[in-house]
Each structure stands twice: as C-alpha cells, then as structure tokens.
Curated annotation (Swiss-Prot):
Its cofactor is Mg(2+). This is Phosphonoacetaldehyde hydrolase. The lineage of its organism: Bacteria, Pseudomonadati, Pseudomonadota, Gammaproteobacteria, Pseudomonadales. Mg(2+) binds at residues 15, 17, 189. Keywords: Hydrolase, Magnesium, Metal-binding, Schiff base. Pfam families: Hydrolase. The gene is phnX. It comes from Pseudomonas paraeruginosa (strain DSM 24068 / PA7) (Pseudomonas aeruginosa (strain PA7)).
Length: 275
C-alpha cells in the first residue's frame, strides 16, 4: 500500500477560551489572580497571562517559578513554593473557576458562522483546552446553550501531558478517525497551543486579537485606534515567532479563508511539516 498525501483538510482542532468562547480569555486569568490572593500573594493580570495555554497546574507551577512571584511567596510563608503548595493553590483555583466560568462563556463574534462554514467544507471539529475535565464539562454545556457543539473534546487531564506536548491534538485525531495529521489544522490563541499543533505535525493558525495575547474585550478591541492595533499585532506576532504558526489572523472569523488556502496548498503537494 502506497502513501498518498491528503488532498484536503479533514479536521479543525479548536482551542476554547480566547478562540471560540471568552473573547480576551478572561475566565482563567482573573481566577489565577484571585486564587493566589487567597494565599496572600499578589499576582498581576499580566503575570497571570504569561503561561496561558498550559494545563492549569502547570500554569500555576510556572507562575511560582517566576522569581518575583516566588519572592512574594517567600515573604508570605518563609519559604519558596513547593509542588505541594502549587497543588494547594490549584485546589483553590478549581472551585473558583467552576463558580465563575459562566461569566465569560459568550461565543466569540463570528465563531458560529466560521465553524458552520468549515463543516460545509467537510471538516470535523475537534477541540482541546488547558482546562481539566471538571471545568470543561461546564464550558461545553454553556457553549451548547449558545449553539456550539464540537465533535470531540479533550481536557488537559485526559492525556499524560498537556500543552505544549501534542497529546491532546493527537487524541482528537484518533477519536475523529482522521487518517493523516497533515489533514488537520490546529487553531489557538496561545504559543503552547500552537506548539502543540506543530509537534503533532498539523497546520497551525495563531489568533492574535481574540485571546490571551491582546487581553481585551471585543468592544475594547474594536475601539482600538488603527495605529495602536497595528502595534499590538506586531508585538503579538513577534511573541508567536518561536512557535512558528503557519498563519496568523485576528479572530476565528477569518478561519474559513485560511482553510481554503491550506486546501490549495495541499492540492499542490505542500505539507505542514515542510513549512
């Protein structure tokens, strides 16, 4: 049996917060700040956004490894944070996250239309998140009330290693019955999510304005002066450089045009691993 390169995309694997729901990715960010505050440790919104895209325990561990935050913890507790301390913060983070997730559950403008267009082109819709399953259960239910149902969902604690490892993306490939990773596109607003897609051998699309990197509401984003928006896009594109996304667009609303372009490239024999 001979290997045949895929001629078209078969699946889009979408992130959740900052990609399909929660413009600006506020739900997890604010809760990190609140969870640390309950332990008497101040963390800014900007600091909390830094590791976004990772699983939430890993995110907290990464924050605790930042020298400035580690020093604040040492001042409060007389020692640097251990893994047990990270787990304690995580266990406080979880109920706060579940309690407040509904406050940031609105679909990103244009998401439903874009996803419907992808389905019309024959794509299955996979998904994955840095949220654990207990949070994803609520996120998925809220999205369904707003009209969005993915074909498959993989939470960060349903695989051995979360992002930037490729396990969640590859779990979607298996569950959706996709026969070639090059027939998949991974869409995300964070560099760990783009690295996940790259390491899985997929096409990747980084979202520059709807998620964690810009960190604004939709109204704030639309109200930005053109020059400021251009500066922010340049900053965010530079932030993504190391993850090497194949495409950068502002929001998921632009995804159908990207898919058409990828299909044209596949038809010419191009593959994601070679670009």
């Amino acid at each position: 049996m001979n290997y045949n390169q895929p001629a078209t995309l078969q699946a889009a694997i979408l992130d959740w917060a900052g990609t399909v729901v929660d413009f600006g990715s506020f739900a997890p960010t604010q809760i990190f700040v609140e969870a640390f505050a309950e332990f008497g440790v101040q963390v800014s919104l900007e600091e909390a956004r830094g590791p976004m895209g990772m699983g939430k325990w890993d995110h907290i561990r990464t924050l605790c490894d930042i020298p400035a935050i580690a020093e604040r913890y040492r001042v409060a507790f007389g020692r640097l944070p251990t893994d047990d301390d990270v787990t304690a913060i995580y266990e406080r983070f979880m109920p706060l996250q579940i309690e407040k997730i509904a406050e940031h559950s609105a679909l990103i403008p244009g998401a439903l239309q874009a996803i419907a267009e992808l389905r019309g082109m024959g794509l299955k819709i996979g998904s994955c998140s840095g949220y654990p399953a207990v949070v994803m259960e609520k996120v998925v239910a809220l999205a369904e009330t707003n009209g969005y149902v993915a074909d498959h969902v993989v939470a960060t604690d349903e695989v051995p290693n979360g992002r930037p490892w490729p396990a969640q993306a590859l779990a979607n490939v298996i569950a959706l019955g996709i026969d070639d990773v090059a027939a998949c596109v991974k869409v995300d607003d964070t560099w760990p999510g783009i690295l996940e897609g790259r390491r899985a051998g997929m096409w990747t699309v980084a979202l520059t304005c709807s998620g964690n990197a810009l960190g604004l509401t939709y109204e704030q984003y639309k109200g930005l002066p053109a020059a400021e928006l251009e500066r922010e896009r340049t900053r965010i594109e530079q932030m993504f450089e190391g993850a090497r996304p194949h495409y950068l667009v502002e929001t998921i609303a632009e995804l159908p045009a990207v898919v058409r372009d990828i299909n044209a490239r596949l038809a010419r024999g191009e593959m994601p691993q070679g670009n």
